Amino acid sequence: VDCIKKKTDVVNKITKDLNLNNVEVTWANVKNINKNYDFIVSRAVAKYNKIKSLCSNKFLNKNLNDKKNGFILLKGDNAKAEFYKCKEHHEFSIHDRIKLDYYKTKKIFYVPNPYIHMDN
């Protein structure tokens, strides 16, 4: 979901070129979306609390993957403080896998659905 059509057009092209059939790209404002998702993926557009508030009630209740439904967020190295109140979160260094200077300060933060406790 993105409100900028140019971005959604690019992502649609990438998903088509890679033959990714389990990806849905929507050109809209997240506030106007009435669907639910396994994962919400974001790239450093806002602080975690803002993203969390925009995405309340946007997760599917049933987990269909190895990881629990939740947020997957690309953030800079200084974003760790955004997650100090999270009951559970995991941080991954991108540079550990992609040895480009650009990724030295980039992290992926995974936060399981913070709205409900899910055991399945």
Identify what each model region corresponds to:
Residues V1-S42:
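Conserved SAM/SAH cofactor-binding pocket of Class I
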Residues N12, K52-C55, Y84-K85:
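Short amphipathic alpha-helical segments
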Residues D17, S56-F59, H89-H90:
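Glycine-rich, phosphate-binding/catalytic loops in enzymes
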Residues L20, D66, K87-H89:
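Short, well-ordered coil/turn elements that cap or connect secondary structure elements
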Residues N22-E24, G70, E91-S93:
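Conserved beta-strand segments of alpha/beta enzyme cores
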Residues K31, Y37-N61, L73:
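A short SAM/SAH-binding and catalytic strip from SAM-dependent methyltransferases
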Residues K62-A81:
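Conserved beta-strand signature within the Rossmann-like core of class I S-adenosyl-L-methionine
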Residues N78-N120:
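Active-site capping/gating segments
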